């Protein structure tokens, strides 16, 4: 949280498999409500934690999401994250075949992925589907899936992704989308430019030095009322 809000120039990879696999299958903060595990055999009553909500709520300057079955997309996003100045957070939807197999099947399964994945590209319309004719529009204050060519919907009606938008409202809405009602948003959801932590510190130190009353420690010691102690 503090890395994100301070915008320290680092890259963070968050592997989300919705389970604690390394500790033999305990439920995790991102586990779906009701999941049964060794540490909670009757099902968890906790609401799942959202990495995207945390990132955007902490004013992250870069947030992206990929799936572990798409190495080409991961490579592209990793490069973009490395080139970004500030903290980048990439959520990797990862399958745990031992303790939580197929947890993201509704997004990654071969037979559904074309209709359940929306790859976001800055400046391009939010289109998806086998024929790339499904899209996202704003219906009042909510997102809605539509089909181009139906109900007088034209391609021009589809939202254009703007990852550089300072206001995170739409970014948060996109990040929350999940099947079956919506496709899951993949790619770079948010990428805004703001000063990094070290840039802010350096700028502050430079200003204080330039405007300091005393330029050296010697000037400080010789300022004001002074006296000598003689033996």
Positions of predicted regions on the chain:
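Short coil/turn connectors at secondary-structure junctions
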Residues: 5-11, 15, 59-60, 84-87, ...
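Glycine-rich anion/phosphate-binding loop at the beta-strand->alpha-helix junction
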Residues: 18-33
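Flexible, low-complexity linker and terminal segments
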Residues: 98-231
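Conserved thiamine diphosphate
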Residues: 29-81
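Short, hinge-like loop/turn segments at secondary-structure boundaries
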Residues: 3, 28-32, 81, 106-109
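ATP/pyrophosphate-binding catalytic subdomain of soluble kinases
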Residues: 61-117
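Thiamine diphosphate
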Residues: 1-21, 73-76
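Short beta-strand segments
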Residues: 11-16, 91-93, 189-191
